[in-house]
């Protein structure tokens, strides 16, 4: 019977029942009772921790990239691209009995609602920098050319921000020529 609980996502914490030992009914009722303490088994999602089943998994890592390309009107490269990237890593806890994410308190215990049911949690994404945002970029100055965007504003980034490519196009400035006879 205990294996059914373990297969359902619980883990054995303690027991006064000695597994593998033969027990027989006793007239002393106390000898017929055993205390087995089970708790919900948890899966810790931490792709940076070698002990986590998520270790090294790309499913829990997202990288958001912004590339600013500098081109002439004909599409050829005018200046080296500016690339910025921010990496996000997901963390969470899954209750093996339900297969759902749960919330833990500061002591590592599952937080429950007024009906003693676990409060459903989610993955928490953390950026590899304190303030996840792309920096403002001033377009390079090219002699004889004008950029259609003199700068690209900075923007906040989340794990759900799509990658983006911004194209800055340089147009040749009009030139005056004086012809002398």
Predicted regions and their residues:
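Surface-exposed interfaces of beta-sheet-rich extracellular modules
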Residues: 1-27, 107-157
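Conserved beta-strand and immediately adjacent loop positions that scaffold enzyme active sites
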Residues: 2, 67, 100, 108, ...
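Short loop/beta submotifs within extracellular cysteine-rich repeat domains
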Residues: 11-14, 43-47, 73-79, 145-148, ...
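Conserved "repeat-terminator" motif of extracellular CCP/Sushi domains
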Residues: 20-65, 70-71, 154-181
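A short, flexible low-complexity segment enriched in Lys/Arg and Gly/Pro that occurs
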Residues: 68, 76, 119-120
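Acidic/polar residues at beta-strand termini and the immediately following turn/coil
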Residues: 72, 93-100, 104-105, 113, ...
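Short, ordered, surface-exposed loop/turn motifs in non-cytosolic proteins
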Residues: 74-98
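Acidic, serine/threonine/proline-rich low-complexity intrinsically disordered regions
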Residues: 80, 97, 105, 130-133
């Amino acid at each position: 019977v205990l294996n059914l609980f373990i297969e359902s996502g619980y883990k054995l914490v303690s027991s006064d029942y000695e597994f593998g030992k033969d027990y027989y009914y006793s007239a002393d009722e106390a000898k017929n009772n055993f205390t087995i303490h089970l708790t919900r088994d948890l899966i810790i999602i931490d792709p940076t921790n070698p002990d986590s089943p998520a270790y090294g998994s790309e499913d829990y890592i997202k990288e958001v990239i912004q590339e600013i390309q500098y081109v002439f009107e004909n599409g050829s490269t005018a200046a080296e691209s500016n690339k910025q990237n921010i990496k996000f890593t997901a963390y969470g806890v899954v209750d093996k009995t339900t297969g759902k994410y749960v919330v833990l308190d500061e002591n590592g215990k599952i937080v429950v609602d007024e009906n003693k049911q676990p409060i459903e949690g989610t993955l928490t994404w953390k950026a590899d920098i304190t303030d996840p945002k792309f920096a403002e970029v001033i377009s390079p100055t090219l002699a004889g050319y004008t950029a259609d965007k003199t700068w690209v504003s900075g923007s906040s980034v989340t794990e759900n921000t799509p990658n983006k490519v911004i194209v800055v196009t340089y147009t040749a400035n009009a030139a005056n020529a004086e012809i002398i006879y």
